[in-house]
């Protein structure tokens, strides 16, 4: 009997993307602590707790780093530095009474105690902290420390790995294969790129022959022998596995720098050679996070912490036994729970938890859908990520024909440069945000205050001679000793409320600046329901050659997406092609110097977009002038229109 013919299944139709925003299970509202407490004495006690916790956290970070370095140099396995491990470190660095839950991992406790007595305590004659009354606060701190350690590894390991490859494979390539061919530099860059790509895609057989020897020499020191799916994925799921590889890379940088300094100390070399050698010194990174600032940071305070802090001895036990039933009573006794800020939304309920540094406060709210959630129960994660315009269905693209398209080019100088097809523009610059948030003014206040206390500057100048990033065990011990000395001398200076008030003021004014910008979008381009913002997918998370203050990346995109319909556009070639003719453009040079963000197109001379009035066009009569940001915005508008009306991307803006 002949087999039945199988009818091929139709490919699933593109249903597009869901623009409905799912409400987050939690949200926070910022306010000042003094505005919600009933008695100033409460503020005083909370402030003491914040300062005490800050001192514990500073020492905990240094202890963890030293312990991990000790194991690294002994070639022993570094354990997962999770919240459980951090809780044992707290027990090692402090003393408490015998009440409460007993520890289960006695082997780890004994190891940490032995390390503390033999290695850490003698560095500066460390005195153990009194952990009494912190049993409900320390678990939150342990989670925050774990988050900092894992985020450092998750966010930066791949970038650090690529930097290590770029530096040392480059030197190896020059030593082994350098020649006078004109294409040598191009070939070298291609081979190094192929090496990084092969590592990222887990295809080691595709590593170029010229770099296989170098890779095999370093492979076991920069990559694990076993990993899940890929290095990038495994780093996200098992970040602590990559601590020793981070140590190794920093160690190699340090050895390289020592070699450079030995050459500099040679009295026979010229000043020009010294300058050249100094330029080769490599900057080390923080393989494990540290808290170097003495300014007290936010801690989490819940109902149990409040009972521990403020309730009378006879009442504590009874209140702690029935927390949920008593939480409203407890909070109402010490806080102004009748204030409107505690019931701003019908969809969210106050979770009886705050985060504070003694000045500013974040109130934690939970969605009504999880109001009955039991402790430890899982909550479905919310994905409100921004979608690419390429992901839209034909129906959704047809809807965009009725909307005004606004392109937005993210960057370092202009955080967002926005433009529509009518020529309306809106800029949100880094300088504007800095000024409106009072960050610049507040930095000046901090520096003035420091200059009035010259001893602080002298102490910090002395401390700068010791590297916090070193992987050398002895040198890191020296840093811990000097850091402790500096902290003891500057602690009172930084614990002054001025610094926390400045930080609080910066946050509140920054939020005002962002709200003002969001309102300006509507004022410039029309009603929020009538516009669609197509924003470039560049992110300073990947690093930038432009130096300057840290700026918003994905955070600003998410901020815009909260209020407006927002789509991402692949920025490929938008800065390299002329917005008029889609041919190549180049940076304009006058007297050998590039003009900042000024581009020129030799293919077209008629349109003169964004040409500065003070430029003498007779100097470069062969160019049509364009500013980099406006050129990119117009190109992104063209790509968006092409996608909407022709359902594809122009070939000039597609990777070959």
Model-assigned labels for residue ranges:
Residues 2-656:
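Positively charged, helix-rich recognition surfaces that bind polyanionic ligands
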């Amino acid at each position: 009997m002949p087999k039945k013919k199988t009818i091929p299944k139709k490919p699933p139709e593109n249903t597009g993307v869901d623009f409905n925003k799912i409400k987050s299970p939690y949200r926070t509202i910022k306010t000042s602590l003094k505005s919600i407490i009933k008695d100033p004495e409460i503020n005083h006690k909370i402030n003491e707790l914040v300062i005490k916790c800050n001192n514990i956290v500073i020492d905990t970070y240094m202890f963890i780093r030293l312990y991990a370095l000790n194991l690294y140099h002994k070639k022993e396995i570094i354990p997962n530095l999770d919240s459980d491990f951090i809780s044992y470190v707290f027990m090692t660095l402090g003393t408490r009474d015998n009440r409460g839950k007993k520890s289960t991992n006695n082997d780890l406790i004994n190891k940490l105690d032995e390390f503390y007595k033999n290695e850490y305590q003698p560095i500066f004659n460390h005195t153990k902290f009194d952990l009494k009354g912190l049993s409900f606060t320390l678990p939150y701190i342990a989670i925050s420390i774990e988050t900092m350690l894992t985020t450092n590894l998750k966010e930066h390991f791949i970038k650090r790995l690529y930097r290590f490859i770029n530096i040392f494979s480059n030197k190896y390539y020059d030593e082994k294969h350098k020649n006078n061919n004109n294409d040598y530099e191009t070939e070298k860059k291609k081979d190094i790129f192929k090496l990084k790509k092969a590592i990222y895609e887990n295809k080691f057989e595709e590593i170029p022959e010229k770099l296989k020897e170098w890779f095999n020499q370093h492979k076991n020191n920069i990559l694990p022998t076993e990993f899940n799916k890929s290095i990038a994925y495994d780093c996200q799921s098992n970040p602590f596995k990559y601590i020793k590889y981070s140590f190794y890379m920093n160690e190699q940088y340090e050895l390289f720098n020592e070699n450079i300094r030995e050459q500099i100390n040679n009295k026979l070399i010229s000043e020009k050679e010294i300058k050249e050698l100094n330029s080769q010194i490599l900057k080390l990174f923080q393989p494990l996070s540290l808290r170097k600032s003495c300014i007290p940071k936010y801690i989490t305070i819940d109902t149990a912490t409040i009972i521990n802090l403020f309730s009378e001895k006879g009442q504590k036990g009874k209140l702690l036994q029935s927390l949920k039933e008593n939480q409203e009573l407890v909070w109402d006794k010490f806080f102004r729970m009748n204030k409107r800020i505690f019931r701003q939304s019908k969809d969210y309920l106050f979770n009886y938890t705050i985060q504070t540094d003694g000045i500013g406060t974040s109130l934690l709210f939970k969605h009504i859908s999880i109001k009955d959630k039991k402790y430890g129960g899982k909550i479905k994660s919310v994905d409100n990520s921004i979608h690419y315009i390429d992901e839209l269905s034909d129906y959704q693209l047809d809807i965009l024909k009725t909307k005004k398209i606004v392109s937005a080019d993210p960057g370092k100088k202009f955080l967002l440069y926005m433009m529509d097809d009518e020529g309306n523009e809106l800029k949100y610059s880094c300088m504007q945000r800095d000024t409106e948030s009072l960050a610049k003014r507040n930095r000046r206040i901090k520096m003035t205050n420091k200059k009035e206390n010259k001893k602080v500057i002298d102490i910090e100048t002395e401390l700068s001679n010791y590297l916090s990033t070193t992987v050398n065990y002895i040198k890191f011990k020296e840093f811990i000793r000097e850091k402790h000395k500096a902290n003891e001398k500057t602690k009172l200076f930084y614990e002054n409320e001025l610094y926390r008030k400045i930080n609080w003021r910066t946050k509140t004014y920054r939020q005002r600046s962002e709200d003002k910008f969001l309102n300006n979008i509507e004022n410039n381009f029309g009603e929020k329901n009538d516009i669609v913002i197509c924003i470039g997918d560049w992110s300073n998370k990947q690093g930038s050659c432009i130096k300057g203050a840290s700026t918003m990346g994905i955070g600003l995109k998410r901020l815009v997406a909260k209020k407006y319909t927002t789509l991402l556009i692949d920025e490929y070639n938008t800065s390299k092609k002329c917005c008029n003719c889609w041919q190549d453009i180049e940076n304009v040079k006058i007297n050998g110097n590039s003009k900042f963000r000024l581009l020129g197109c030799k293919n077209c001379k008629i349109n003169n977009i964004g040409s500065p009035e003070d430029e003498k066009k007779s100097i470069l009569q062969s160019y049509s002038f364009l500013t980099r940001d406006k050129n990119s915005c117009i190109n992104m508008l063209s790509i968006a229109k092409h996608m909407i009306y022709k359902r594809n991307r122009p070939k000039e803006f597609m990777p070959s």
